[in-house]
Structures are given as structure tokens and as C-alpha cells.
Amino acid sequence: MTRKLVLLRHGQSQWNLDNRFTGWVDVDLTEQGRREAAAAGRLMREEGLQFDVAHTSVLKRAIHTLQGALAELEQDWLPVNKSWRLNERHYGGLQGLDKAETAAKHGEDQVKVWRRSYDIPPPAMDLEDPGHPIHDRRYAGLDRNALPGTESLATTLDRVLPYWHDAIAPQLKDGKTVLVTAHGNSLRALYKYLNNVSREEILELNIPTGIPLLFELNDDLTVKSFRYLGDPEAARKAAEAVANQGKAK
């Protein structure tokens, strides 16, 4: 039996548009982002996907993308699980900074390492910073030592994997069709795990906003196939645009 999993990065957010590092800052979608969410729903509807359950983060750009896609699918009733473990990678002291200006200051190579390397985190956010998640009431029930002040992709994967094993994988093994709407780096982490991508290869992986990535999985959840829905060239160009965000103007 083939299991189906869709990974969907949220639509364009205001800070995607502004080319700023977002991380755990709770920025909403732009109008373009809302259109992308609806378009993702149409692509999934055209594919004939009937989901049993959905998962998302606790950040509204992902939540609103999921809501927009489910409305287009006419599956608004779907059970939805929200978890901080699906949040975007925490960008530490870079959060809120303009990516191009940061590249001009520190060099494109350094910014690429911070954005796309596997195990090198950006400079950490100070615990006293009001933007640190220990001061956010949505995380009040969590061990403050589990809340990051910065993350690499490796530590993001360490955060995401327990949720995969405890919540998502059992549903897939039960034969459920699952939709995960999350963020560029939490989805890169899942992609790396599912496809056993090397540390070197993951540096070049960019996930576009608002384009569903369909995985077909075997019974043991190894990957049988995966592809973006819709026009492959559109997905390629969108991923290329993501890669260019970290370049100086």
C-alpha cells in the first residue's frame, strides 16, 4: 500500500517579501501568500488528494496557509494538530535583519553558511531579548531549556524528528494521507531525513513557498517517489528565487 504525505511551505509572508530573516517571529502572509495558499489547495484538489489529518506549526503564516489550502480543497473540517516542533528554524540574532544588507556586511558566503549549512547556527539571541521564545506565552508550558535562541539545520532536525516519530509517522503507517504545512527549514529537515540527503547536498536545497511536495511512501515509510505538484519549471524558478534571497544587491 502506498502512503501519501504532502509537505507544503507556507505562502509568501510579509518578511519574505521584505527579504528579512524571520525565524520564530510571527509574521503573517501577504496577499500574494494568501493566493499561493489557495493555489496550493487547487493543485492538491486537482491531484485528487483526500487528507485524513493535517499538521502545522504555531506560527500564523503556516496556520493561515493551511486554512487557505483546506478551504480550496473543501476539507476545512480536517483535524489539525499544531506543534512548536514544526516551527521555522530559529535564526537567532539575525531575526528581523535584511538578508541582502546582511550579505553585503558579512559576505554572501557567510550568509549562505548561516542560511543553508547543516550544523552552523547564526549568532544566538540573548535570553533577555523580548523576542526570545521564553518570553512568548504560546510556549509557556514548555521547558525553557528546550526553547532555542538560535538553531542550525541539524538542531532543527533534532527538534522536528520527535514529532515525526510520535505524531506523523504512526498516522502514515495506519494508512492515513497526511498534510504537513510548515516552513522552509523545518521542511528541509524532514526532506533530509526522508531522502537521506547528505550534509553537502542539503546546502543547495531550497523549498519554494506555496507549492505542494507530494511524497509516495512504502509501508516502512521509505520514499517510493516525490514531486512538486503543478508545473515543474515553475517550482524550479520559485526555488531559485529562494536561493537568491541571501545575495547582496
UniProtKB/Swiss-Prot annotation:
The active site is at residues 10, 88. CDD domains: HP_PGM_like. Pathway: Carbohydrate degradation; glycolysis; pyruvate from D-glyceraldehyde 3-phosphate: step 3/5. Its EC number is 5.4.2.11. The record marks 183 as: Transition state stabilizer. InterPro entries: His_Pase_superF_clade-1, His_PPase_superfam, PG/BPGM_mutase_AS, Phosphogly_mut1. Gene3D superfamilies: Phosphoglycerate mutase-like. It catalyses: (2R)-2-phosphoglycerate = (2R)-3-phosphoglycerate. SUPFAM superfamilies: Phosphoglycerate mutase-like. One of its GO terms (molecular function) is phosphoglycerate mutase activity. GO terms for biological process: gluconeogenesis; glycolytic process. Substrate binds at residues 9-16, 22-23, 61, 88-91, 99, 115-116, 184-185. Keywords: Gluconeogenesis, Glycolysis, Isomerase. Belongs to the phosphoglycerate mutase family. BPG-dependent PGAM subfamily. Homodimer. HAMAP family: PGAM_GpmA. Catalyzes the interconversion of 2-phosphoglycerate and 3-phosphoglycerate. This is 2,3-bisphosphoglycerate-dependent phosphoglycerate mutase. The gene is gpmA.
